[in-house]
């Protein structure tokens, strides 16, 4: 029996990673399905395989609860670009997954139901998008076909979202003539999914994709840097070996390249024996691409989500770091009370979370209050691949309580040196 040959991925236009973010039930998955349907039917340079709502929201527990838990990946093309799109979860309990999804975005489509306006999760997703490096956001105000809405209400919703985005450091373009925001689109994802030829239906998808093409800037890809990819998932393929998937953060990889698997466990050396993108072979994976990489001789159980694949010797695992953090206020969804030296939250680096202990500066306050901005020393339970500049989120009990950036790796510092700078509080053993 002949083996079916893999298709070759055709890289014929600029590539961008994008995704939907926003509050639960505001229509992110419906919009994602509507985009694929529009691109599959429109012609004129638009291309996609239609993905129905149920196909995107595909795990049984997701459909039963009516919410998206894990991130789903789809692809489509406009006349200008090729998009890899992640549909991010919106439920507060699954912000951990949202962080993973948002880490794979160059830009985002913020979905806001016009009937509700900006909600708590809307605000947290905007904040998280900024923290994980999403460069640009366009807005889709959904459910604009509702009889509950009038022009005045929609203008209020638009104004609120605009203020929210600007306050988090996102720029929104303004029309010079009428002051409107062309990156804020009104529509109905359901009307579009049902194929309605109207301004709120398919017309809104056309406008949305045009706004993505125009206002979400193509990022500068770190193609020339040392290869680095966070491992999001690991699969075992019978007869071929182990495949790891993720977004290439920098550099390039091709068949035959030697790589290291770094973080959490002992560093392992292996070789790339294949690169795929959307189940199609690619000659070379480049920074910004979501890929699957086949590894020679690596066992499924020896590799895990949260490790990184990298050029040998280019990045190393660490447990001790000095970081600058900002803590969230109660209004932003953070802690209601402060914390002291010895605080033990979860730290999220790229695609992994690890427990760590946060210690406060010796010359600082005794307690960190919500909204504070300061330097801390962190000691992680497990070594994580990181370097100066790496970003992370801080979570506790299902709530994002802060975010930070690595200022210095401190593994080489002695306990005495660290104790001169930070209030080291050790647990007393009985």
UniProtKB/Swiss-Prot annotation:
Reactions mediated catalytically: GTP + H2O = GDP + phosphate + H(+)
InterPro entries on file: EF-Tu_GTP-bd (IPR041709), EF-Tu_GTPase (IPR050055), EFTu-like_2 (IPR004161), EFTU_2 (IPR033720), G_TR_CS (IPR031157), P-loop_NTPase (IPR027417), T_Tr_GTP-bd_dom (IPR000795), Transl_B-barrel_sf (IPR009000)
Transmembrane intervals: none
Region (G5): 188-190
Enzyme Commission code: 3.6.5.3
Record has Hydrolase as a keyword: yes
Gene Ontology MF terms: GTP binding; GTPase activity; translation elongation factor activity
PROSITE patterns: G_TR_1, G_TR_2
Positions with a binding annotation for Mg(2+): 29
Cellular compartments annotated: Cytoplasm
Highest taxon above the source species: Bacteria
Region (G2): 66-70
Domain tr-type G, residue spans: 13-220
CDD domains: EF_Tu, EFTU_II, EFTU_III
Disulfide bonds: none
Subunit-level organization: Monomer.
Function: GTP hydrolase that promotes the GTP-dependent binding of aminoacyl-tRNA to the A-site of ribosomes during protein biosynthesis.
Protein name: Elongation factor Tu
């Amino acid at each position: 029996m002949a083996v079916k040959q893999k298709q070759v991925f055709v890289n014929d236009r600029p590539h961008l990673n994008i995704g939907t973010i926003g509050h639960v039930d505001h229509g992110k998955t419906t919009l994602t399905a509507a985009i694929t349907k529009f691109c599959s039917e429109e012609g004129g340079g638009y291309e996609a395989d239609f993905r129905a709502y149920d196909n995107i929201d595909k795990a049984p527990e997701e459909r039963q609860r009516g919410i998206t838990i894990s991130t789903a990946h789809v692809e489509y093309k406009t006349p200008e670009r090729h998009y890899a799109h992640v549909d991010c979860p919106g439920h507060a309990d699954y912000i951990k997954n949202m962080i993973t999804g948002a880490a794979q975005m160059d830009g985002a489509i913020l979905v806001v139901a016009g009937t509700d306006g900006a909600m708590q999760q809307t605000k947290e997703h905007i904040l998280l998008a900024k923290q994980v490096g999403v460069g640009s956001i366009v807005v889709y105000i959904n459910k604009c076909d509702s009889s509950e809405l009038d022009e005045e209400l929609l203008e209020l919703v638009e104004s609120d979202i605009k203020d929210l985005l600007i306050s988090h450091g996102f720029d929104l373009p303004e029309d010079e003539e009428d002051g409107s925001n062309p990156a804020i689109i009104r529509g109905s994802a359901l009307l579009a999914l049902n194929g309605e030829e109207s301004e709120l239906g398919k017309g809104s998808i056309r406008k949305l994709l045009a706004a993505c093409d125009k206002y979400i800037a193509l990022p500068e890809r770190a193609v020339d840097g040392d290869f680095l990819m966070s491992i999001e998932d690991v699969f075992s393929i019978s007869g071929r070996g182990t495949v790891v998937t993720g977004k290439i953060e920098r550099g390039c990889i091709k068949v035959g390249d030697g790589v290291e698997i770094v973080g959490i466990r002992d560093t392992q050396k292996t070789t790339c024996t294949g690169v795929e993108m959307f189940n199609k072979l690619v000659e070379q994976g480049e920074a910004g691409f979501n890929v699957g990489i086949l590894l020679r001789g690596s066992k499924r159980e020896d590799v895990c989500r949260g490790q990184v694949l990298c050029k040998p010797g280019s990045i190393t695992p660490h447990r001790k770091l000095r970081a600058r953090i900002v803590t969230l206020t109660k209004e932003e969804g953070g802690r209601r009370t402060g914390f002291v030296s010895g605080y033990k939250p979860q730290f999220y680096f790229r695609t992994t979370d690890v427990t760590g202990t946060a210690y406060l500066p010796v010359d600082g306050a005794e307690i960190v209050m919500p909204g504070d901005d300061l330097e801390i020393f962190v000691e992680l339970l497990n070594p994580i691949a990181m370097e100066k500049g790496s970003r992370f989120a801080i979570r506790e009990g299902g709530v994002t309580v802060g975010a930070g950036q690595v200022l210095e790796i401190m593994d080489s510092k002695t306990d005495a040196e660290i104790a001169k700078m930070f209030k080291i509080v050790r647990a007393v053993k009985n």
